[in-house]
């Protein structure tokens, strides 16, 4: 199940957390994996651990020219990208009434506009080959909202609308477009929470635990596989029941 041998995947934001887990899981399923990120040393460490079938593609997603070059280089070096995982994202949290234009623009540029640009770059060759899997990592807050994150929530909600629209445009070319929406996932950020904060979070989650990055990555592996050929325009929520959507 979920066999990906010979498929070529590009994973953005692969230098840690969920992105790293996605890269590891896709590689374990047999894919050739392109690792994108800005922390080159971390990418090199991950590549060394994975061994063969790995290529590195460092780039700044807030730079229009670098995004275009990333798509072109990945397509050339991987000899065709079959699977695109738009995972990279940033936050610039703050109350809406105090949010600066820069904080809004920066988050939307990386989390949404770069997704548009990179996906556009790689969709054309996918259409020519009549095969592709585009998987966008959004968030539960893209559906529920979250105070202090109007910019981030807007970017993640935008990804969902983007994915549904694109899915309808290119379905006849055997290209699927889907989202995976994580909830609270164990990470370096959640490790910094104190016990009281963690208890408050757990109380809101029916499973009474946080998810793991591997659980998110497993949903990505499914959507990337042939088994998900009839699934498009959908959002898989990996949140332990925090939001039953």
Curated annotation (Swiss-Prot):
The keyword Magnesium does not apply. Pfam families: adh_short_C2. Substrate binds at residue 139. GO terms for molecular function: 3-oxoacyl-[acyl-carrier-protein] reductase (NADPH) activity; NAD binding. The active site is at 152 (proton acceptor). GO terms for biological process: fatty acid biosynthetic process. The keyword Lyase does not apply. Keywords: NAD, Nodulation, Oxidoreductase. NAD(+) binds at residues 11-35. Coiled coil: none annotated. Proposed to modify Nod factor fatty acyl chain. Belongs to the short-chain dehydrogenases/reductases (SDR) family. NCBIfam families: 3oxo_ACP_reduc, PRK07231.1, PRK12826.1-2, PRK12936.1. This is Nodulation protein G. It comes from Rhizobium sp. (strain N33). The gene is nodG.
């Amino acid at each position: 199940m979920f066999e990906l041998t010979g498929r070529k995947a590009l994973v953005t934001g692969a230098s840690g957390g969920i992105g790293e887990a996605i890269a590891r899981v896709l590689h374990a399923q047999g894919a050739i994996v392109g690792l994108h990120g800005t922390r080159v040393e971390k990418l090199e460490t991950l590549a060394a651990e994975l061994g063969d079938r790995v290529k590195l593609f460092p780039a700044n997603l807030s730079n229009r020219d670098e995004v275009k070059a990333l798509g072109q280089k990945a397509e050339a070096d991987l000899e065709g990208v079959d699977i695109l995982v738009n995972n990279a994202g940033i936050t610039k949290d703050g109350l809406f009434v105090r949010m600066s234009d820069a904080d809004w623009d920066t988050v939307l540029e990386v989390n949404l506009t770069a997704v548009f640009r990179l996906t556009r770059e790689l969709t054309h060759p996918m259409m020519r080959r009549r095969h592709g899997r585009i998987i966008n990592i959004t968030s539960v807050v893209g559906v529920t909202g979250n105070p202090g994150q109007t910019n981030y929530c807007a970017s993640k909600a935008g990804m969902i609308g983007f994915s549904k629209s694109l899915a309808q445009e290119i379905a006849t070319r055997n290209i699927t477009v889907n989202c995976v929406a994580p909830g609270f996932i164990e990470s370096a950020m959640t490790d910094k929470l104190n016990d009281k904060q963690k208890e408050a979070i757990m109380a809101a989650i029916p499973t009474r635990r946080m998810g793991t990055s591997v659980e998110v990555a497993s949903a990505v592996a499914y959507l990337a596989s042939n088994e998900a050929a009839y699934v498009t325009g959908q959002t898989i929520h990996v949140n332990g029941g925090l939001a039953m959507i």
